Structure formats: C-alpha cells, structure tokens
Amino acid sequence: MELEKVKINSLHCNDAVLSSHQPSPSATHPQSVPSKANAVTEASIIEKTNLQHNVQEDNSYNRDCDSPVSSSSEPEKELDDLRYLHSSSLTNSVVVGKSTGSLNGAYSITSVTSKTKTLEPNSASGSACLTIAPTADHIKKRIPSSRTPTRKALRIKFYRNGDRFYPGITIPVSNERYRSFERLFEDLTRLLEENVKIPGAVRTIYNMCGKKITSLDELEDGQSYVCSCNNENFKKVEYNTGSQPLSNLTLTNSRSNSHRLAKCRPSSPLKNGLLAGSNPLPTCGGGTGNGSPHIASRSSDRVTVVHPRIVTLIRSGTKPRRIMRLLLNKRNSPSFDHVLTAITQVVRLDTGYVRKVFTLSGVSVVRLSDFFGSDDVFFAYGTERINTAEDFKLEAEEHRAINVIRKTMRTTGTTCKGPKPKMPIKSKKVYPPVVDSEAFKAATTPEDDRHAALLTSTGMEINELPSNIRNTYTLGRIIGDGNFAIVFKIKHRQTGHSYALKIIDKNKCKGKEHYIDAEVRVMKKLNHPHIISLILSVDQNTNMYLVLEYVSGGDLFDAITQVTRFSESQSRIMIRHLGAAMTYLHSMGIVHRDIKPENLLVKLDEHGHVLELKLADFGLACEVNDLLYAVCGTPTYVAPEILLEVGYGLKIDVWAAGIILYILLCGFPPFVAPDNQQEPLFDAIISGIYEFPDPYWSDIGDGVRDLIANMLQADPDVRFTSEDILDHPWTIGNQGNECTTYKR
C-alpha cells in the first residue's frame, strides 16, 4: 500500500480545489491493514524521505532565483505557505493509521495526480476533502523566467580626512546609482555637510593606506575610505574604525535620517562652532532642559571661547627645543580632545600622541578655554616624565625664537618716523568725465552717432558691437579702463536698469587668451550677493563682450581717495562682505589672485556711507587643483609665498584682504617703499614685519589689530582662512561691542 505524508494546504493557494464526495478507491477494495507499529514506522520513514525531497526542491528554487521576489508576489506567498506547512509537519502532519481528532472519522490517503494530493474521509458523514499544497516544481514553473538578478550595491564607509573622532557614514554605492565619480563627490559633500563642517567640496577619495581612488571600480564592498576636500593631502591618523557608523544613510531618506540622528550626534573636529547668539546644539535628552548640565556647559564653553587664534607650541625634547605655531579655529577646536589632536599632528612627538599641555609658567591646561585665554605659548608632552624644575625654563635661543614670532603678532602702536606713507598709484585709469558732459547728453545727434562717438574715442567701430547687445542696451559713459579691457555703463532699453559692459581686446591678450576663458568660465559658476554677476557673454574674433552687474558707487580705491580712512564700523561692513565672497569662492576651490581696492565695487547711501561691497574682475581667477606657481597680482597686495615662488593656494586672497583692511583704517598700506620701488617693497613683504604707527592707529582698537595680524601672517599654514575672518570676534561684533581684551 502506497503511503504519503499529508500536508494541509493554505487557503491562500490559488490552485486549491475541492475533491468530489466519492468513495475512495482504497475503500472499495479491501486490503490487509498493517499493524499499528508497522504503520507508524513506515510513516516515519516516508516522512523523512519527503522532508529531504522538499529541502532539495527549496535549494533548487533558491539557485534559480538569485534575486528575491517581492514579498507581495503571489508565487512567493505560495512558497512561504509551503515552507510553513513543511516546518510544522513534524507536529501537525496526519499519520496514516491514526485519527487526528480534528475531522469526523478516520482518513485515508490517496494520490490523485502528480501535482495535487487530496485528503478524503472514510465515512459518508465526513466533510469535504481538502487539497494538499502544490509542489515546489509547480511553483517554479509559475515564476517568470525573464527575471534577471541585479548587481548588489556596495556598502562603503567614508571618513573625513584627518578627523579621528568622526565615526563616518555608510552609504550604498553602485554604478546604477552613480553614473560618474563626480556624482559620488557631490553626494558625499552633501552628506558630510549634514554631520561635520567641511572646508569645501569633496574632491578626492583615498583608501585607508593613502592611495588615491580614481574610479568607482576601485571601491570594494565593506571597506572604508577617506574623503578629502579642496585637494588636501591624505592624513594618516587612527580613524574611528571601531565605532558604530553614525548613520547608514541612503540617498532617498538621508534628510530624515539626519534629522532623526542629529539629536545624539557627537562633536566632530571639523564641525563649525556656533556663533554667539546662536541656538545651542541639541542634546541627547531632546532639549536643553532635559540634557546633562555638564554637556550643556561644555557646549556653552565652546560657543563663547573658541575663536580663531595662533598659538606657539614648544615640543618636548632635548634643548634647544623645536618651536612651531598652530592656527586654532572652530573647525579644529570644537573640544579639548580635538585641540590635542591638532597639536599632535603639528609637533609629531616621538612618544606618539600629546597627552599633557602646560602654559609657559608651568600651569597645566585642562580646559578648552585655557587655549583661548591670555597665554599663547604652550609646552606639549606625551607620556614622558616632566622635570618641572628644568623643562619650563627657556634657553636663550628659545627665547629669541619666541620673540621673533611675537614680533609678527605685535599690535601695539609705534611712533611714525617721517611723513605719512601714501597710497600706491591706481593701477587703472578712468576716462575724464567729458564723455558724460551735459552738452553731450543734450546733443540732438542720433543715438547711433552717440554710440559711434563713444566707441571711436576708444578706437572701436559701432559695427563691431554685437547686434544683441546693440539692440538691447543703450551705451553710456566709460567708467573704467584696464590693461586689456574697457568698461562702459549701459542701460537696458525696456527695463531701464543699468549694467556694465566690459569689452576685452583679444589683440592685447596674445598668448594670454586662457585668462579670458578662465574669467568667463569662473563667473558663469558664481552666484553670490557680494560678487558681481555675469549677465551675458558674447565671444567674437577680435573682442570678448561681458554684460555685468552695475554698482553705482564706483570702486573702493576712489572711495578711499575721497575719505582717506574709514571708521571701524564701516570697515567691519566691508570686511564682512569681502570675507563672505572669499569664503564662497574658496569653498568652490577658486582663488581670485587680484583682490585690491580697484576690484572692489561699493554701494553708498546719500551720506557717502558704504552699504554694500562686491568683488569684481575675475581676469586672474582660476580653480586650485594643486599648488600654483605663476607670479601675478598687484605688488602692494601680493603675498610672500608668491614672491618666494614656493607655491601658493587660496590664502593669498586672505593676505590681500588683510592689506585692504589695514588701508581702510589708516589710509596707507602696511608695506611701503620709497618712490614705489618694487625691490625694497618685496623685501618688506617677505619679512612680514610691519607696524601700527601712531598717531594714525592711536584711536583704533586691539580687536581689529589682532585680526589684521592674523591675516598678514607670512607663513600661510598659520594664516587665517576666509572663514576665520568671519569667525573673529571683531568681525562678529558691532559698534557697541568693541571692548574685547586681546592679550599677546
């Protein structure tokens, strides 16, 4: 007698059918019934056989279907039902020769077809027979064969370069999600900005050994990589590889995840601290009231004390000891531990990490605020033993080195010897106002004749002007002239809005055409309230025409000539706007290379006060992908590293801005030479030594002097960044908050 294991099929099975109430063939032909013990033994053997058969079919199904079916698909539901019944068969299966007690009468098993098994009652009073679940072979035939497996996305963890406290982010990476390497850079930039403060866009990816990754194919599943911004070199530190990832972000719900996880996000060495008056960081308790007082005090301490400053470090070791400097700001000093990490990277102790820091008087530094107090010289120690009697004494050579450093940071006034220094000669001329005279305006000549007269005065013909510019704008007076270009004031015929038309003569730029292309390319990328906007560009064989935003007040050089010097409040407005423009440029990896008063346009009110400042003239601007070596710029504003030809980057703009801020407050530059001779001027710039002479600086506070001293550091590594300018207390303050004490 053929015996089969009984499995009750789920009611969800679409192939379930009800068998007719007919006598079972096994019931009409009497057969010998085995003993109860034999029946149980035989049923157990058959049950094991069917169990192995079902496991083989399940494995075959898994091999055929590499990509799992959606949980809502009908075949998977059937297969789940089959597996569920199979898993429960050891306890709920009907065994031949035994009554289950759940149906009326005993049951016998009959094989109806190869695909369907039915259960029928022996007695006429039994209920309808139930159909057994279809086999796995039948389910496999119903699964669409056109389904192809998709490539699994790689799970990659990314760290911030040099940030050993940041736990990293884990995101899926695949060729389907990222069609190009640049697209991955964009998403990493966005995701990192939600967690840490980064100095710019992600431009390079390294593996944990420092090897540069150049394509998506080089990324490996489950591995970690380091993101670098603004072409920073790889920093080999102990990244936080042992911690849990900050968030397993997906690109579809990154904003919601970021908002959810922000409540308990730890501090990062590159997270920009909050400005005074900003809301404090949320705590893990969900609010300031429920948070830990210790955490709240640390956050408040960071907000109030951290500001950009340069400190001097004395490395422990054999005397005379090495002396170096470090720029502390809100990006590398959000906590005490982060400052120790920054010091470790600079001093490079033989014993490893810096564990202990002392002031020059031997007082242990234990709080973040101690780095931003009156002391600016610190001893850095690792695990070595400290000899308090000898280690805190400076030798004569060490004293001299510290005094040289302090000389570059000196903000005290000195008596001016000789006549007052003068401003340098303006680097570009402005045409006399005869072109804009009332007689010329009242002339009855046709408009084209007026345009022709204006252009003829510059050696150009009216027919050379592009038709779309000639038909859209009316030509006004000449407002400026450079080495290669002429600037007209123009007015839109329909709206009446004023614009500036810059005409670049290509014949005067032979061999320098790349500067023109770079200017247009850079300006098309820019959109900032303190940067002149490019409205239209027309390229012709002989000239390049640029329609630009017009600023009514003229350039800053003329404003300085008229008023000689500005107040601190007026200077603060202008340096804020210039700092914001530079920060925007530098975040995009763009350096201006020619920041000077002639290229800064100002908007004035009726009393002559500056309301707004805008950065213009991007003829020398370029993207910074590596150190630059081209010697360019204006002598008075050129940085030392340009003159030394050792390579320069974004911080040359900060140097030029420091020169301008100095000029705004006293009316002359910090570095001057008799008769404007270049060689003595360049020697003075390279030395980096200047003064704040009285009486011109006697009424100017220490706050702005400190800012200038940090912007005019000859060493670009410790020179302020454009963001540090905006974070400085003097820049943040106002007229009623200029009493901050600055000690050196």
Swiss-Prot record:
Q: Which PROSITE patterns match?
A: DC (PS50309), PROTEIN_KINASE_ATP (PS00107), PROTEIN_KINASE_DOM (PS50011), PROTEIN_KINASE_ST (PS00108)
Highest taxon listed in the record's lineage: Eukaryota
ATP-binding is among the record's keywords:
yes
What's the top EC group for this one? Answer: transferase
BP term (GO), one:
intracellular signal transduction
Q: What positions does the domain Doublecortin occupy?
A: 154-240, 309-392
Q: Where does ATP bind?
A: 479-487, 502
This protein is called what? Serine/threonine-protein kinase GM11705
InterPro entries with a match to the protein in the record = Doublecortin_dom, Doublecortin_dom_sf, Kinase-like_dom_sf, Prot_kinase_dom, Protein_kinase_ATP_BS, Ser/Thr_kinase_AS
- A Pfam entry, by short name: DCX
Q: Which residues form the Protein kinase domain?
A: 473-731
Keyword Nucleotide-binding among UniProt keywords: yes
Entry keyword set: ATP-binding, Kinase, Nucleotide-binding, Phosphoprotein, Repeat, Serine/threonine-protein kinase, Transferase
The catalytic activity, as recorded, is:
L-seryl-[protein] + ATP = O-phospho-L-seryl-[protein] + ADP + H(+); L-threonyl-[protein] + ATP = O-phospho-L-threonyl-[protein] + ADP + H(+)
| Signal sequence residues | none
Q: Which residues form a coiled coil?
A: none
The UniProt record lists the EC number as 2.7.11.1
User: One GO molecular function term?
Assistant: protein serine/threonine kinase activity
Catalytic residues identified in the record = 594 (proton acceptor)
Give start-end positions of Polar residues composition bias.
17-35
Q: Which organism is it from?
A: Drosophila sechellia
Q: Which family does it belong to?
A: Belongs to the protein kinase superfamily. CAMK Ser/Thr protein kinase family. CaMK subfamily.
What segment(s) does the record annotate as region Disordered? Answer: 17-38, 54-78
